[in-house]
């Protein structure tokens, strides 16, 4: 009850004032307006680092490890995404890592099967065998219908269209592997004609007689 | 995992393995266990990149995989091992220890295995022999047998161990009811009985010297040779990894011996070293104290160059037992006295000394006096602190409150009355060693993270200058190889101007300081981690 009376003993606190560390008349420390500084000044200087042969050897080891780990195959860099325009320098920068290859061969028996990245061989042989595999049943099918020549001719036309479709699908599926092959074709074509003349403007007349081979109805003049 | 540990792991992964692995690793740490698809979705990376990163992490033992929550039929879940990533900070120390114990050969063996994660014995031997031959003078080459003997010694003293085998290979013979899972949990390496058994391999030959002029051809020939050679050795599928626990026991022993040598004298340090060496094989990793050794055994096992008489040895042992640090304890009287080394208590004392020294260096010796007082006397009121520490009241108050704001000292209220009136409550200050040690450990992780970031910042700021100096060094090296004149060399050297040279020099100095700081903080981290682990093991 002594502390609850408002009138008497108004300036009494409920605890021992001396324990606060300052008297009643002293000024309070200034209020802070900003957060404390990021690098507050230190009261005591830090002790200098150890020195000695052991320390320097470990320092050299650390720096060597750091430098050599950048050259190991474990240092993974993402393949650069294709920019919008193909550039001349792309032909000379084939050292870039591809995302779907792994540069070292771990012991696959110690890793789960889903992590296995099969390194794909160059695409030419695989597409060649695929095309051969798919051609053989179609060639066998066409051999069975030799009796009707018109139908075989029509089927050959259909087969070539289907092969083109399969070729397009393969191109869509295996973008990266086919593009270097396709680019190589373009490069070869460009290298063959080193002149300034655009190849498509020049018509060397080879296609003149060949177009009319299929339709023998019209007479040749 | 705490935020500081996650940040430090991310920085270490980025330094050694690049941004992609850092991205994958950080997501795995934050999310606990993840499947491959979930991880690819979270990190928004290509699936192949995620697969490659996981291969790298598993190869280095930082990630383990196991059957998921849906059992063996469900997708595989990956779980990251943060301590392994933090061990990367300590690689130079492991390599230096191997060098001091087993020479250059041992050093290179441990370095190769640390950098590659796991290796077979034959490939390690070949690579190390080639590297040693490269550094030897012309005409000499390193014989494989020497490297094999160094490897065997490392395995015999348990510094290297076999990687635990995958159980899926052995379970293929079971019945159809349990289909062999695509993957199983790898067991603890120590539980495998052949953990430290050396395989029999037929490997003989010399290290090959690689000539710098025919680098390309030699690489191709070496690659082809590697393919044919690997089929000859008989240790397929037996991979070796570094046994970090054994290195940590060695570091702990070193810390105890150096503490005893500093506190007492060199001879006491030697006696404790002898005791620890004798109980290496008989003491398990988490034991609180070594096996009891009699004074007679210690006397016989002392190194021969220490000619201590028997009574003097007894006096030293009595001194060690009576020392307040309690490194050595007396366990009995038979055989001239049975003595043990108190490992856990030694670690606790070393951690306490570290805490006291940190307070002393940051807040001054008077604050350290208050801190030590509270450590010993447990709970004290403010008035008692002032009296026992013999510090004037105002300063003592200020120091106590500074320590309190840094969380190094805790405040405990004990009310006398149910209404917790401040004038009728005891306020007691106390220091708890274990939580304070944990707090300091987090500060250490943050420190190392800051040091690494500052080093990356310094390197990035001066990237142009560093690249220029690297190019000039390459030009100089190629000129010297082709035998250029001195004038040409000086011309090339002058391409770097004097102020640039100064800038480079100061940059090198800063980076050396930061790296050295990282190594030193790592020593504190090791001490605090060992102490915290020892308290957890004893519970």
From Swiss-Prot, chain B:
Region of interest called Disordered, as start-end residue ranges on this chain: 165-234
UniProt keywords (A-Z) are: DNA-directed RNA polymerase, Nucleus, Transcription
Q: List the disulfide bonds.
A: none
Compartments (UniProt record): Nucleus
One of its GO biological process terms is:
DNA-templated transcription
Q: Compositional bias (Low complexity) spans?
A: 167-179
Chief subcellular location? nucleus
GO molecular function (one): single-stranded DNA binding
Q: Where is the composition biased (Basic and acidic residues)?
A: 212-230
Write down the InterPro entries for this protein, in alphabetical order.
Answer: POLR3C_WHD, RNA_pol_III_RPC82-rel_HTH, RNA_pol_III_Rpc82_C, RPC3, WH-like_DNA-bd_sf
- Tell whether Nucleus is among the UniProt keywords: yes
Q: Which GO terms describe its cellular component?
A: RNA polymerase III complex
Keyword flag Nucleus: yes
> Which proteins does it associate with, and in what oligomeric form?
Component of the RNA polymerase III (Pol III) complex consisting of 17 subunits.
Function, as annotated, reads: DNA-dependent RNA polymerase catalyzes the transcription of DNA into RNA using the four ribonucleoside triphosphates as substrates. Specific core component of RNA polymerase III which synthesizes small RNAs, such as 5S rRNA and tRNAs.
| Family (UniProt) | Belongs to the eukaryotic RPC3/POLR3C RNA polymerase subunit family.
Please state what the protein is called: DNA-directed RNA polymerase III subunit RPC3
In which organism is this protein found?
A: Danio rerio (Zebrafish)
